[in-house]
Amino acid sequence: MWFRNLLVYRLTQDLQLDADALEKALGEKPARPCASQELTTYGFTAPFGKGPDAPLVHVSQDFFLVSARKEERILPGSVVRDALKEKVDEIEAQQMRKVYKKERDQLKDEIVQTLLPRAFIRRSSTFAAIAPSLGLILVDSASAKKAEDLLSTLREALGSLPVRPLSVKVAPTATLTDWVKTQEAAGDFHVLDECELRDTHEDGGVVRCKRQDLTSEEIQLHLTAGKLVTQLSLAWSDKLSFVLDDKLAVKRLRFEDLLQEQAEKDGGEDALGQLDASFTLMMLTFAEFLPALFEALGGEEIPQGV
C-alpha cells in the first residue's frame, strides 16, 4: 500500500475520532452497484480485504486508511446523439412534421433511460489516510475533483469535516523557479531532471523537459525570458522521489527500494501483514517528509480566523 499521488488537506479543528466511530459512520455510506437507471453511485469500501465483514477502516498506530469507490455507467454522448437523430428523422418522415426542442429533449431522456441498463460500468477507487495527530488528511490522487468527492462523502458520513487544502506562504512557482535558477533546493531536497516551464501570460508558451539537465544554458535562458517553473521533479532524503506542481499536488510518488524492502521485512509472509507494514512505513515517512516539504516551500500559511 504505497500512495502514488498526494493531495494534502489541513484539518482546521481537532478531529475527535476513533476507529469504531469512523467505522460506524462509513457504514452509513457504503459503496454499492448502480441500479439499472442510475448513472453513478459513490460510497466507502474496505481498503484491505473483501467480503461483508471486511472493515471499512484500517488502523495502524494512530493513522486511519479509508477507501471510496465510484461506480458509473458509461453512456457515450455520440451513441445518444445517433439514437436521437435516428428517432427524430423517423418521426419527421412518418408524421410529416418538425420535431422541436421540447420534444427533442423528452426523446433524449427516453433514449437515455432505455440505454442505461445496457451501458458499460466503470469502477474506480480513491484511498485516503486520516492522521489526526498530524492534523492532516492525505488523499492518494492528483485530481482535486476526486479528492473533493471523497472528502464531501466523508463529511456527509461524519456530519462535519473542518478541512481545507493546505497552502504555503510563498507561491510555489516562485520557490520552484528559484530552485532551478540557483541549481539548489532547500533542506534535504534535490532537483532531478524534469520540469515544466510556463510563460506568465495567460496564452503564453509551455515547455516540458524530461531527462534533461536542468542546469543547462537552455533552461536558464527560458527562466531569464520570464518563464516560471510550474512542475519540478525532486528527491527527498534518499527515501522518495516525486513531481511537485504549482498547486502543491505531489505526483508520481516513488518510494525508494530500501523503504519497500523494510516494509517487506516487517510484514512477514502474510498478505495483510505486508499491506499493513507498507501503509505504516509510508505514513511514518510522510510524518517526516511533509513538514520538511512545507518548510522548504516557505512555511505553511494559516488563514486568518482559522
Swiss-Prot record:
One Gene Ontology term, aspect cellular component: cytoplasm
HAMAP family: RdgC (MF_00194)
Entry's localization field: Cytoplasm, Nucleoid
Gene Ontology terms, MF aspect: double-stranded DNA binding
Protein's job: May be involved in recombination.
Protein name, UniProt field: Recombination-associated protein RdgC
Gene: rdgC
One of the GO biological process terms: DNA recombination
Keyword annotations of the record: Cytoplasm, DNA recombination
Organism from which the protein derives: Pseudomonas paraeruginosa (strain DSM 24068 / PA7)
Family: Belongs to the RdgC family.
PANTHER family, sorted: RECOMBINATION-ASSOCIATED PROTEIN RDGC (PTHR38103:SF1)
Pfam family of the protein (one): RdgC
